Design a protein with these regions (language model features):
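Conserved small/polar residues in nucleotide/adenosyl-binding loops
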Residues: 271-278
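Internal maturation/activation junctions in enzymes
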Residues: 189-270
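Extreme N-terminus nucleophile/cap motif
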Residues: 123, 180, 263
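Short alpha-helical scaffolding segments that buttress acidic/His motifs in well-ordered protein cores
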Residues: 52, 109, 180, 206-210
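Short glycine-rich loop/turn motifs
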Residues: 153-155, 177, 261-266
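Noncatalytic scaffold domains of N-terminal-nucleophile
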Residues: 1-122, 126-172, 232, 236-246
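M16/insulysin-pitrilysin zinc metalloprotease superfamily fold
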Residues: 174-190
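Cationic, low-complexity basic patches in intrinsically disordered or flexible, solvent-exposed regions
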Residues: 281
Length: 281
């Protein structure tokens, strides 16, 4: 609430770095889990988080790829006492195959499993997060956490090989996925072997072009009026396909696509075979 434009002007802040407290938004995932479970869930909420809590409490062997990334960020982790305490072992990153435990996370998940939304947004956990962020210079307040809400949106759809594909609306990358699928169908990508050079090349080019559109045109629907049908039209998809050269790599002339170091993956499981209960998961 306090992070308005005037604050950044007064403090001459022109860029917000990835490690800046000003880049930290109010976490929405926990609220979304609880809201979806309340609306659609059939199993006990404690069971939903039980697996994650067990992995955090009992530990798991570090994957080779994660060990490499961990090592690359070792210096960054040493700069903050909390990250140093939680993610370093005797001041070193965890190695491939080494068991990593995160007891504080396990304890937090247990509180959430018992108290749900209040356990994360109106609790000692909230106070601790706000205190930590404020100490780093953040403007976050407990009220910001209390006011967090989950929005339920209608899906956006498009056809693909006689199937109806549903995706989340903007500003998620759902529209990008639908555009990619439309391009693969337009280019008849299935005629190429899955492991062929042609298939890999087309998939890479399609991804680059669609994400370029996302980065240069799409935005928050509250501030950017986008007509989804325009970007899924036959004419527009054809124009995107025309940018692809089967013998050359596509290079953006507008701007480079910025890297995003984090992402979220969410999976919902269906626990019933009764078609009438398909809405319950």
């Amino acid at each position: 609430k306090k992070a308005n434009l005037q604050f950044y002007k007064d403090n001459k802040i022109k860029n917000i770095g990835l490690t800046s407290p000003h880049s930290v938004t109010i976490p929405g995932a926990v609220h979304a889990w609880c809201s979806m479970h309340e609306k659609f869930g059939r199993i006990d909420f404690k069971e939903v988080l039980n697996g994650a809590e067990n992995f955090a409490r009992k530990g798991f062997p570090v994957h080779e790829v994660e060990a490499i990334a961990w090592k690359e960020n070792e210096k960054k982790l040493k700069k903050n006492p909390n990250s140093k305490r939680l993610f370093l072992n005797q001041n070193l990153s965890y190695s491939y195959g080494e068991v990593f435990k995160n007891i504080p996370l396990a304890n937090t998940l247990r509180v959430i499993s018992k108290n749900k939304i209040k356990g994360f947004y109106q609790s000692e956990i909230t106070k601790d997060m706000v205190k930590t962020l404020n100490k780093l210079g953040g403007l976050h307040t407990e009220e910001d956490f209390y006011n967090q809400k989950t929005l339920f949106s209608k899906t956006i759809t498009n056809s693909y090989r006689n199937l109806k594909i549903h995706q989340c609306p903007l500003n998620s990358p759902g529209l990008v996925v639908l555009m990619m699928m439309a391009m693969t169908e337009k280019l008849n990508i299935k005629k190429y072997h899955p492991s062929s050079f042609e298939r890999y090349h087309l998939q890479a080019e399609i991804s680059k072009i669609c994400f370029e559109v996302k980065e240069t045109i799409f935005g928050d629907p509250n501030f950017n009026n986008i007509n989804i049908k325009d970007y899924l039209s036959n004419e527009y998809i054809s124009s995107l396909c025309s940018r692809i050269n089967k013998n050359k790599i596509y290079s953006s002339k507008k701007s480079s696509v910025t890297s995003h170091p984090e992402t979220i993956y969410l999976s919902c499981l269906l626990y019933t075979s009764d078609a009438a209960d398909d809405k319950q998961c």
